[in-house]
Amino acid sequence: MRNVLKAETLERRFPLLSVENGCIVSKDADLTVAFEVELPELYTVTEDEYEAMHSSWIKAMKVLPEHSIVCKQDWFIQETYRPKSDGEEQSFLTRSYELHFNERPYLNHRCYLFLTKTTRERSRRRSDFSTLCRGFLLPREITDKDTAARFLESVEQFERIMNDSGHIRLRRLETDEITGTEERAGLVEKYLSLSLEDESAVLQDICLKPGRMRIGDKRLCLHTCLLYTSPSPRDVEES
């Protein structure tokens, strides 16, 4: 019996065009800057500090131009703890601590922030508003160098506001940290392999089905929280 399921190549569906000067350029000419985020330790933030963090996010987002997208991703990957072996001699307490948690399951957490500059046309794209009707392939706005320069300036302001808050640290990712090198896996490679390891990962089959997403033998569980539905700090405190 012939298999009627259609298989797509990752190369054909891959949405990224290139990474230049630490900026991700999509095939739709969207411009994205990526950050690694360092958050406060769990249960260490008071109510007033949480309010201040919330205000910092709002203040930082207001400096971004129109048609910008702010995407904060929290990756939680279930792993088993492995003792650190850096070659240094460990004390009795340190060695006992490492052995106590050896091979215990835990959630490895990593947080990333993506700031994207898109266009008005992307938000109103329809089947009758294709490139065949427009007469040009890329939006005129995105080909304007001044538009890109203004966006990057606003990104720097965003980073400065968040770092000055004293609770959250943003570190902009360089090109090699996004694309990877021969020795170290980049963000894209980690994303496609569901791994936080710095060593180069082996890419596996990606299965996308209704109600199920899987990469190799790893399953995905996704939760999306939109800004206009996100609870305020006071709502979280009262719940």
Task: Name each model-derived stretch.
Residues 1-230, 234, 239:
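Extended, folded cores of ATP/NTP-driven motor/assembly subunits in large transport
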